[in-house]
């Protein structure tokens, strides 16, 4: 009996040591930190293919990615994959916010693994992400941002949680699955003037979207709210027991991919940043658009940001518009809509043309008789041979 107890105690100690190693990221395959990104093409360099974007002229300075801080709110199907992609890209710092735990029901989605069931999502995500890239700094918060106390702390961290403590984050990403949390993020970012991106997947799992929101410049989430928000309907009353939204890892992977792609374009200043990009998996349709802010938005901070944006735009120096004269088009008015423009200059035309008769205004000649060039003084003597004789001479040649 005593031997069994001692064996169990030994096993407990081993498990505790293993748990400590996992928490600290100390296990096989864990690499050391890399101080400086390198474009050297070797198997041991995790950044060589990322730095190739610079060599190919896509990104001017990819190393700048390490100077940015991004906050990801919601570490579920979209948020966890978003955090993983940013980690692999070498982002400087990630702030993760979520209050949920990993469940076996999450395994149909990406990132999390069965042995992480029971852990908080932010804790499980941090452990995995540190092993993927130890160069990234992580800050995790396991709470619901919609409560009063937590909301104030959330605002404090996105306004002071940058790489340089006391500086704001560069971007906030909303990857939550409910409108209450979206409205909380919207309110916080409007009050702080913080640029953020919103994302979501439909309940039937076959469509999704991303949206870039610049307070005062573009429509916020409250400017054109969904019916559930506009009608002040409690989301909990819409959910029946035993009924849940559908979930496809493919759709969530696509939405996370276009979200991070938009983040990289925004932070590293390349390509065209999308203000709104939708995804419909049924027709493989990707609609895009940009929405202006609503002057009667219910969010007072949004209206305030709109006024400040108008003042900034009015203070900018006006750019002078250069008027470009259009070339004269010949034969513009005809039944076939044909526009014919001469490629010959007027000087060349005059030199090659003969005398032009006097015609009424608006009438032009179709062609002119070319000027006859003077003949040379060389004269060919007449041989007085007939045509038949000349043909016979040619046959003998």
From Swiss-Prot:
Q: Which GO terms describe its cellular component?
A: cytoplasm; cytosol; endoplasmic reticulum membrane; Golgi apparatus; nucleus
InterPro entries per record: D-isomer_DH_CS1, ThiF/MoeB/HesA, ThiF_NAD_FAD-bd, Ubiquitin-activating_enz
Query: Active-site positions, per UniProt?
Result: 244 (glycyl thioester intermediate)
Main localization is cytoplasm
What's the short name of a Pfam family annotated to this entry?
Answer: ThiF
- What Gene Ontology molecular function terms does this protein carry? ATP binding; protein homodimerization activity; UFM1 activating enzyme activity; zinc ion binding
Q: Which UniProt keywords apply?
A: ATP-binding, Cytoplasm, Endoplasmic reticulum, Golgi apparatus, Membrane, Metal-binding, Nucleotide-binding, Nucleus, Ubl conjugation pathway, Zinc
Motif range for UFC1-binding sequence (UFC)? 382-397
Q: Where in the cell is it found?
A: Cytoplasm; Nucleus; Endoplasmic reticulum membrane; Golgi apparatus
Give the matching CDD domains: ThiF_MoeB_HesA_family (cd00757)
Superkingdom of this protein's organism: Eukaryota
At which positions is motif UFM1-interacting sequence (UIS)? 329-341
Chain sites annotated for binding ATP: 77, 98, 121, 144, 178
List the PANTHER family: UBIQUITIN-ACTIVATING ENZYME E1, UBIQUITIN-LIKE MODIFIER-ACTIVATING ENZYME 5
Question: What's its job?
Answer: E1-like enzyme which specifically catalyzes the first step in ufmylation. Activates ufm1 by first adenylating its C-terminal glycine residue with ATP, and thereafter linking this residue to the side chain of a cysteine residue in E1, yielding a ufm1-E1 thioester and free AMP. Activates ufm1 via a trans-binding mechanism, in which ufm1 interacts with distinct sites in both subunits of the uba5 homodimer. Trans-binding also promotes stabilization of the uba5 homodimer, and enhances ATP-binding. Transfer of ufm1 from uba5 to the E2-like enzyme UFC1 also takes place using a trans mechanism.
Q: What is this protein called?
A: Ubiquitin-like modifier-activating enzyme 5
Can you name the source organism? Xenopus laevis (African clawed frog)
């Amino acid at each position: 009996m005593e031997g069994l107890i001692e064996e169990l105690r030994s096993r407990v100690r081993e498990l505790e040591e293993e748990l400590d190693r996992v928490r600290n990221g100390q296990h096989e395959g864990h690499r050391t930190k890399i101080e400086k990104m390198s474009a050297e093409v070797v198997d041991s360099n995790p950044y060589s293919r990322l730095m190739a974007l610079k060599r190919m002229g896509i990104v001017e300075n990819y190393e700048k990615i390490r100077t940015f801080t991004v906050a990801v709110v919601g570490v579920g199907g979209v948020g966890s994959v978003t955090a993983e992609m940013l980690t692999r890209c070498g982002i400087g710092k990630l702030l993760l916010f979520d209050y949920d735990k990993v469940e076996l029901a999450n395994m149909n989605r990406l990132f999390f693994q069965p042995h992480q069931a029971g852990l908080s999502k932010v804790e499980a995500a941090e452990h995995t992400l540190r092993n993927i890239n130890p160069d990234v700094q992580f800050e995790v918060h396991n709470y619901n941002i919609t409560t009063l106390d937590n909301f104030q702390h959330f605002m404090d961290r996105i306004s002071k949680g940058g790489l340089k403590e006391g500086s704001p984050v560069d971007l906030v990403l909303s990857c939550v699955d409910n409108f209450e949390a979206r409205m909380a993020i919207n309110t916080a970012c409007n009050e702080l003037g913080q640029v953020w991106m919103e994302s979501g997947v439909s309940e039937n799992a076959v469509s999704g979207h991303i949206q870039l929101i610049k307070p005062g410049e573009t429509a916020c989430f409250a400017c054109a709210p969904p019916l559930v928000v506009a009608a002040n309907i409690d989301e909990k009353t819409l959910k029946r027991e035993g009924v849940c939204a559908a979930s496809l890892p493919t759709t969530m992977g696509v939405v996370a991919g276009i979200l991070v792609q938009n983040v990289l374009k925004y932070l590293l200043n390349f390509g065209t940043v999308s203000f709104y990009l939708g995804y419909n998996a049924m027709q493989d349709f990707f609609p895009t658009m940009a929405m202006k802010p609503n002057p009667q938005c219910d969010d007072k901070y949004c209206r305030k940001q709109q006024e400040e944006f108008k003042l900034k735009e009015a203070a900018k120096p006006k750019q002078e518009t250069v008027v470009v004269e259009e070339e004269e088009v010949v034969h513009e008015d005809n039944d076939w809509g044909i526009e014919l423009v001469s490629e010959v200059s007027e000087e060349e035309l005059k030199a090659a043309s003969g005398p032009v008769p006097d015609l009424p205004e608006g009438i032009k000649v179709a062609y002119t008789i070319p000027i006859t060039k003077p003949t040379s003084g060389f004269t060919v003597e007449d041989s007085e041979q007939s045509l038949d004789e000349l043909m016979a001479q040619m046959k003998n040649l």
